[in-house]
Curated annotation (Swiss-Prot):
PANTHER family: FERRIC REDUCTION OXIDASE 3, MITOCHONDRIAL-RELATED (PTHR11972:SF148), NADPH OXIDASE (PTHR11972)
Species for this entry: Arabidopsis thaliana
Primary localization: membrane
Protein name, UniProt field: Probable ferric reduction oxidase 1
Functional summary from the UniProt entry: Ferric chelate reductase involved in iron reduction in roots. May participate in the transport of electrons to a Fe(3+) ion via FAD and heme intermediates.
EC number(s) reported in the record: 1.16.1.7
Localization per record: Membrane
Domain Ferric oxidoreductase intervals: 174-294
């Protein structure tokens, strides 16, 4: 190990230590927040020292205690991921082996058939701890409510005892809801360093957003109902509902936020989400209304508690917006006989992504507003100039695309305008640690495994490392779906040498058809039309929005935007808010909240735009020209012959997963599954058996 690598390892350990300290400190704050010790001692002391500042006033306490640590944590996460990105394959896998040996059991499925879906031991542990935090907070608040509120104290406010307690219970429930809201946006920040630093992807984290979303709406709805009952008992329902206090909680703003939240919540019902995806998709833009009026409701001082996650989400969302403004070069499309198309885009060689990554695609000629996620089937290492996605016709949007490209008039289409966001995926993968890799798919669930196979083909010849034996178990409804197997290898980039290092076996099952003749099956698979396009000069190769050092650039955006934000707030507070307010909370809450939100928006927009333009000027003009001049490498026959010779097709039956998976030999067998819910549950159940200690389960799901 060289001096540079040793220094990098030391820096890596220091960053991990700092991140752990910040995380533990934040957890302690959340645990102590509902206690009297926090309110009467800690908070009082902090407000005495910071709350009277002429530069920040009362919001300065929450700005320092809640917002600053999370922005710093995200910043350190970016630095950690940048260092990790340059780790060699052998270094990475040696480290992974040690970690997996210790914590492999925590990744095993624990809950399989339940409302939460497939949940691992680790997820159950963290879910239990989070629910314990909510119950701890609620219990502390309720105890203080029932102890401190007496008949005498209630009478001074003109309330009965039950009314006074109901009033405080409603407040406490709302405060507990803020805990859930504080974590709500982290899982949907697709390019977040916080997700990548702990090995999570945006797709795998969606379920956490769903869980938190349900909790947020259950708690906030209960909060609102308690107040409605209280106001009705006081004969003040209408007047209180329309009340917008200048220097206190705004009831009307809270109701608007709640209605926006309820509209989003209703559309998440599975039948509505699947059958009326457009309704679900468009209604979720109400998150802007929800968060805006939530801040107006509670005031900026209290809103800073759950705001860090939203801040990180805003940075990510605006970067995605900048990327989506460009049309990308769609080079060609392959139309398969199974109502499936493969779109091939030109890619900047500096854009690197891991297998199983996803990309969001927008085609304005089909829908100007709809964005749909698709798994990337190409390998950024094997195909440095091309990025490919496979799209199965399963909804209105994808059906329109297939009809457009498969119709007889498709020859008249010279260009298709496409915009993309992404790719998004794991910061690294650890498939090489396994002795063998078993991939189980159903239908279009084969797509993430195509990218894995291609990546391992490349690594087998270039890194000269041992590649796990691969077994692909794929189930299809019809024989025409077998044409998806022809996409396992790309049309260019492979050489004969690569095939000699790979051991792969494919077991394909056609469930709805009996055995057909070899001639008919081959005929169905060979009907693949290729459509070439002529992109405009303005169309660009898909490129990383923040350049080759994207994590460093994101760290710069997070740090600079936050520093500029606190400087702007300090100036405005010192020369505008403080002369009026004098730390007496007399300044209108809505105006102060608006100042903070506008300042955040301005800093995020300016720093993100500046970073994007700087990277575009420095890297892309030169590399775009390079991409256009690259000549394709035609695939040799041996790799394709290997796939054909390794494929075993079974007609009229489903894969017997118990027979195929139970008793697999080897100290480490990776089991990956992507397909229908029942298939994923079946595989998870097999891997959860006590006798399956050598099976390491991972589920890849398209369904939210």
């Amino acid at each position: 190990m060289g001096v540079g690598e040793m220094n990098k390892e030391v820096i890596d350990k220091v960053i991990k230590f700092l991140m752990m300290v910040i995380l533990m400190g934040t957890i302690v704050i959340w645990i102590m927040m509902p206690t009297s010790t926090y309110k009467e001692i800690w908070l009082t002391s902090m407000r005495a020292k910071l709350g009277k500042s002429i530069y920040y006033g009362r919001p300065g306490v929450n700005l320092l205690v809640y917002m600053f640590p999370m922005i710093l944590l995200a910043f350190l996460g970016c630095i950690y991921l940048h260092l990790k990105k340059s780790t060699t394959v052998n270094q990475f896998n040696s480290g992974v082996e040690k970690k997996r040996a210790k914590f492999g059991a925590l990744r095993r499925p624990m809950l399989v058939n339940g409302p939460l879906g497939i949940v691992t031991v680790t997820e159950v542990m963290f879910l239990t701890m989070f629910m314990a935090l909510l119950l701890w907070s609620l219990a502390n608040y309720m105890y203080r409510t029932f102890v401190n509120v007496t008949s005498e104290s209630a009478a001074t406010d003109g309330n009965n005892l039950w009314q006074a307690r109901l009033d405080l219970i409603a407040v406490r429930i709302g405060i507990v809801g803020n805990i859930c809201l504080a974590f709500l946006f982290y899982p949907v920040a697709r390019g977040s360093s916080l997700l990548a630093a702990v090995g999570l992807t945006s797709e795998s984290s969606i379920k956490y957003h769903i869980w938190l979303g349900h909790l947020v709406m259950i708690i906030f709805t209960s909060h609102g109902l308690c107040y409605f009952i209280y106001w009705i008992s006081k004969n003040q329902l209408v007047s209180k509902m329309l009340e917008w206090d200048r220097t206190a909680v705004s009831n009307l703003a809270g109701e608007i936020a709640l209605v926006a939240g309820l509209m989003m919540w209703v559309t998440t019902y599975p039948k509505i989400r699947r059958r009326l995806f457009e309704v679900f998709f468009y209604s979720h833009y109400l998150y802007i209304v929800f968060m805006l009026f939530f801040v107006f409701h509670v005031g900026i001082s209290h809103a800073l508690i759950p705001l860090p996650g939203f801040y990180i989400f805003l940075v990510d969302r605006f970067l995605r917006f900048l990327q989506s403004r460009n049309n990308v070069k769609l080079v060609s499309a392959r139309v398969l006989p199974c109502d499936t198309v493969e779109l091939n885009f030109s890619k900047n060689p500096m854009l690197m992504y891991s297998p199983t990554s996803t990309m969001f695609v927008n085609i304005p000629s089909i829908s100007k507003l709809q964005w749909h996620p698709f798994t990337i089937i190409s390998s950024s290492k094997l195909e440095p100039e091309t990025l490919s996605v496979m799209i199965k016709s399963q909804g209105k949007w994808s059906t329109k695309l297939y009809d457009m490209l498969s119709s007889s008039s498709s020859d008249q289409i010279n260009r298709l305008a496409v915009s993309v966001e992404g790719p998004y995926g794991p910061s690294s993968t650890d498939f090489l640690r396994h002795e063998s890799l078993v991939m189980v798919s159903g239908g279009s669930g084969i797509t993430p495994f195509i990218s894995i196979v291609r990546d391992l083909f490349y690594m087998s010849s270039t890194h000269k490392c041992k590649i796990p034996k691969m077994t692909l178990i794929c189930a299809f409804k019809n024989s025409s779906d077998l044409s998806m197997l022809d996409l396992i290898l790309p049309t260019s980039g492979l050489t004969t040498d690569m095939a000699s290092f790979v051991d792969i076996q494919i077991k394909a099952f056609v469930t709805r058809e009996e055995k057909t003749s070899v001639k008919e099956s081959t005929h169905n698979r060979n009907i693949i039309k290729t459509r070439h396009f002529k992109p405009n000069v303005s169309d660009q190769p898909i490129s990383p929005i923040l350049g080759p050092n994207s994590w460093l650039c994101l760290a710069a955006i997070l740090s600079s935007s936050f520093m500029i934000f606190i400087v702007i707030i300090a100036i405005i507070t010192r020369y505008h808010i403080h002369p009026i307010d004098q730390n007496s909370e007399k300044y209108t809450w809505a105006y102060k909240s608006l100042i903070y939100l506008v300042s955040i928006s301005i800093t995020v927009v300016t720093t993100s735009t500046a970073a994007m333009l700087w990277n575009k000027k420095k890297y892309y003009a030169k590399n775009d020209q390079y991409v256009d001049n690259l000549s394709p490498v035609i695939i040799e026959s041996s790799p394709q012959q290997l796939i054909s010779q390794s494929t075993d097709i079974h007609y009229g039956e489903r894969p017997n997963l118990n027979k195929l998976l139970v008793g697999l030999k080897g100290s480490s067998v990776g089991i990956l599954v992507c397909g229908p819910k029942k298939m994923r549950q079946k595989v998870a159940k097999i891997c959860s058996f006590g006798s399956a200690e050598n099976l390491h389960f991972e589920s890849i799901s398209f369904s939210w």
